[in-house]
Amino acid sequence: MMRRVTSSLPSALKLGRSLGPNVRFSGGAAAVEASPAIPPNSSSGKTLVRNMKPRELMQELDNYIIGQTEAKKAVAVALRNRWRRHQVDAAIREEISPKNILMIGPTGVGKTEIARRLAKLVDAPFIKVEATKFTEVGFHGRDVESIIEDLYKASLTQTKQNIMRRHEETARQKAENRILKALAGVSDGFREHLRSGALDDIEVIVELQEKKEKPKNSGTNEGVFISLEIPSSIGGQRPQTVKKVMKIKDAIPAVLQEELDKIVDTEDVSAEALRACEEDGIVVIDEIDKIVTASGGYKGHQASAEGVQQDLLPLVEGTTVSTKGNVQIKTDKILFICSGAFHSVKPSDMLAELQGRLPIRVELKPLTKEDFHRIITEPRYNLIKQHVMMMKTEGVDLVFTDDALWEIASIAAHINSTVQNIGARRLITITEKVVEEVSFDGPDRKGETFVIDAAYVRNSVESMMKKVDIKKFIL
């Protein structure tokens, strides 16, 4: 239903304009208080790693990841070297290849988190894959060349977003003009009211291109779909359009997106995406130790594991991969970051050729009691702050004393050292147990202050600690 407002549209009437036939009112009235018609560019506040110095990138990662200075430094330098390579002469640029990285460390110390945070910062095509998802060519499953195809898809998406970001202001102007033309037949006078949101609840008839859903393959990525539909642009035909009655606040995003799509269609997206993929692409391969077999060990259960390593060799060294769309992608300038816990195998158990293609080796250290305390206090949106803010939604003021935080860190370190070391993930288990009662009773404790101290922490995890102690005596 349309929102009725007692005031009419004074600004438009004072201008002496007559609204066109494509406009509908709710009782001749319009909204006078609303959010801006077109949202500001949401990407404008994003700091891109391409323009960041290694120290600045380190500081950004420090907001989320505690310790592991060597790993963060290696990644920061590797990314800065991508920028440096673009600044040198073209003759030497072709000779400079990225120095691939191998991150080694127990589970839960920050390997995956470093990759995840990089994905949010980096202004380059980026994908993260699990090594266990791939099989040797000839076995059932995905082969490693699909990594490069996925990277190219990520590059296409990012390139389109970058083009849209560059031309967003132009598209915004065109979208406003289309709405104003449908609204009043003119684009003078009403633009400020449109931007202020004063016209948001007016219904207007807009003409949008009709979008047809493409048939999807069922279940698998195999096979090729051949479309027999003839594009409407052939033979000079205009794309099919459909008229829709929409509120202005709903029409503007749709029209803006259509204008952006038109701009993207005129740009050479494929060529720019291919260049970005080949020159700036970053691939993170996690759990690489899971495709490594101990020297002299039984290999029957991992028949294709060594084959996956063999298939990775040409990708990491540099080859040309042909995608399903017949796009030729060179991989010699793509940066590969591999990581693994290496609990049951050693890095030296990897194929010697693959070891040689990962020249920068970084060891992440196990977490100590002090590290655990820093993890739940220093990061911008640490685990404790998350629980506090969640309980605030129930009207409960949740307070952790300093000795409670140290107790949580101490228990996490103790359980990791006596049972199995799962790193920082242990903190999630403990804190969830600690806040279990207040989370359950939260709706009934509105307006209360709930204080958690060291004694409360010990009582909450007492049953967990007893199970840990018993396990030490069970063979």
Swiss-Prot record:
Ligand binding (ATP): I66, G108, V109, G110, K111, T112, E113, D286, E353, R425
NCBIfam families, alphabetized: hslU, PRK05201.1
GO cellular component: cytoplasm; HslUV protease complex; kinetoplast; mitochondrial nucleoid
Protein name as catalogued: ATP-dependent protease ATPase subunit HslU1
Keywords: ATP-binding, Chaperone, Kinetoplast, Mitochondrion, Nucleotide-binding, Transit peptide
GO terms under biological process: mitochondrial DNA replication; proteolysis involved in protein catabolic process; rolling circle DNA replication
Primary localization: mitochondrion
Gene Ontology MF, one: ATP hydrolysis activity
Source organism of this protein record: Trypanosoma brucei brucei (strain 927/4 GUTat10.1)
